[in-house]
Amino acid sequence: NGAGGKIGKHLVTHRDVKKVAFTGETSTGQEIMRYATENIIPSTLELGGKSPNVFFKSIMDADDEFFDKAIEGLVLFAFNSGEVCTCPSRALIEESIYEPFMKRVIERVKAIKLGNPLDTENTMGAQNSFNQKEKIAKYLKIAKEDGAECLVGGDIYHSSINPDGFYIEPTIYKGHNKMR
């Protein structure tokens, strides 16, 4: 338990570790690789972070279970609570289906109910830590600075029940590939 940097360094430099696998940010991967070389620990790194979901026109050939699963996949994978490091953080959508596809996605996102995860009426809980909440808040600010158009959400969620909780509104921004 603790900060990823401290724990990661300890694990990657420990003599009992026989293999390192990491998925995440490039600069962190470079650091892990440097540490792993100290004991010549085999390493597998998947770096980059901004892996997209790609949606082509064919997903809308029928308004069926497959189409619903495509929407659900985008919505649910994009709205974890900080526990999934392989989470796709953007979607590339074929232009001809963009409007009707996003209309359905936004409807689904608006149906997400934030709150205590022990309450079965809620569908999304808080972020897993204060640091994760702050990291996401920083990205929300960057998106605005980079000129992204907020389609839904885009802010810290304040609840009267838990005003200091680590909740973030489910958010979708529209932008371009050069955005951070």
Q: Where are each of the predicted segments found?
A:
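Short, basic, helix/turn surface patches
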Residues: 1, 178-180
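A structured beta-alpha segment of the ubiquitous adenosine-cofactor-binding alpha/beta core
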Residues: 1-21, 25
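ALDH superfamily catalytic-core signature
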Residues: 25-178
